[in-house]
């Protein structure tokens, strides 16, 4: 079983230049709720536009190099800052720690096993083949 430990994002979709983190390592279950302050933050129960889908897209982007939804990679970069997008996913499988760092503008692709960086190919182009090979080996 895979245990997602944490996810950090910067300049990804609606997340700006200040790094935001979601820690999944606290309990067996993580519930993500949001309060849309743009709509007054009242008791109407409005949960749209608070970043829940951004979390799912960031998980997909970290693992597979593309959002789960049909968004082009360049459109994942926060439009206000237009650079420095970085998504970091830290997870564990069978007692082994893994970390994937993936970003654009500039392109970043790093893969770590037990905090040891693995050699990547064509990192400057954000090529995900080697990362996908590693992920396939651990059955993700």
Predicted feature locations:
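Conserved small/polar residues in nucleotide/adenosyl-binding loops
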Residues: 138-140
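A short, sequence-level motif marking secondary-structure junctions
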Residues: 103-108, 123-129
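Extreme N-terminal "head/tail" segments of very large remodeling/mechanoenzyme assemblies
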Residues: 1-118
